[in-house]
């Protein structure tokens, strides 16, 4: 059977089950149907063998069993499986959720970013359009308000012009594509910070929601609601556990219960699973509240620094305020992510309530029975510590002698496996204060010292019995975290594409399940340098380089050094010349001199028309 044919067979089985349930008034998801198909095949009481080809009768039997289980809406087992499928499909861990939000934002901005970075605008109209696209990109990236709001566009444009005027588009277009994308992200953060700072000062930003006040108002209510719901769920768990303990001890006063014990056990599983999901959700909400407190504190500090830096000076260097604006935008984006995370957790917690069937199974008399909490059970057996001498086949771990004892990866989600096997599927929380047993690199907790002794004597038998119980009760696989033990068989459609080719040439028949390839983590230590290093600098690995060197050596081997002399060789000689070195010299020249003598004053008289002019000497005598 080819891979396409095998996938078609599986789709046909799921489709037929879905149509049958739909005709009976139930609309079910394919994920739930696929999980139920696997649960039915793994149940040993149904006698399905994954090592042989399923016949038509086997396929028909499989469909009928799945339909019967899926149509039993009063079964706590079905409700628990629905709860598990719902939680797996809707809950996302914190880190994965934040990464997914970042990828969604990038995918939403990808087309705008490509349009901006690939633009070749030259005319004035094209540059104006490009600048408007950048404004739209910043609005979408910051997610502070709607891009259709005219005030938002004006505020964003004004903030962008203060840090990136349109005159800089030319230099922006000359950058590399990666540099353009980086500058777009930086400008988006700075513009977001400017708008948030203006809103904090009452200068615009009316369309921006006040996330800190919304979160401060919503978080306490969500935490209190989850704590109240968790307390109610815990009380139900304690009531079912106490009632099943009385039934397992064959108490004559309570042995005749109006509800079958198996149905009570399934209701206990339903409540315990709800409790586990609520604890996980509440832990994420508390972590979200702590992160919101930190982000708000950092945001207030940044706003104070910006206010002090801007209001006290007429001119502020951009290198001083731009990092603060970017930090404000980044902190606000963190608050938006926490808001989305809180919304997801709230929706998941509220969606779990529709799968609860535990309260309807208890009678008023059973509701009034004394409740013994998990803490009471642990305190009652705290003094009965496990003796090391009685558990020689297993290693004992105690709080005072084991590092990081509170974070040991306990098997079965911390429940006692011995009680599960010996007391008809009763779930009792393990008491780690009496000691934890380590068997084959795995840690086990027990409800009492006697249970620990029983496990140490037959550890392999009990672990196999727990897996057998989980195969008969599929909701325990996730509740006790046994998924890794049930990966030996998997649906064909879940195989990787590379592994599906291994089934080419299979014999005809509907082989629904295939054995998966076993995998395990392994490590090995090797010597880094087992031999002494000897690096040859003249080593050459290239064959053509070695050939070139060989030809060169062969040519040199046939060469002979020769000399020749021309007719003018005898005329060559060394030339020399002699010069006189410069030296300092001086000479004496004459100079002008003067003496004090009368100045000669001689003129002609009678030059104005008188007859006979004469020379008159008015010079003073030398001896005067």
Swiss-Prot record:
**One annotated Gene Ontology cellular component of this protein:** radial spoke
| Pfam families reported for this sequence | FAP206
Q: Which residues, if any, are the signal sequence?
A: none
Superkingdom assignment: Eukaryota
Q: Which UniProt keywords apply?
A: Cell projection, Cilium, Cilium biogenesis/degradation, Cytoplasm, Cytoskeleton
Q: Where in the cell is it found?
A: Cytoplasm, Cytoskeleton, Cilium axoneme; Cytoplasm, Cytoskeleton, Cilium basal body
Is the keyword Cytoplasm in the record? yes
Q: Does the keyword Phosphoprotein apply?
A: no
InterPro entries assigned: FAP206
What is this protein's function per UniProt?
Essential for sperm motility and is involved in the regulation of the beating frequency of motile cilia on the epithelial cells of the respiratory tract. Required for the establishment of radial spokes in sperm flagella.
PANTHER family, per database record: CILIA- AND FLAGELLA-ASSOCIATED PROTEIN 206
Q: What is this protein called?
A: Cilia- and flagella-associated protein 206
Organism expressing this protein natively? Danio rerio
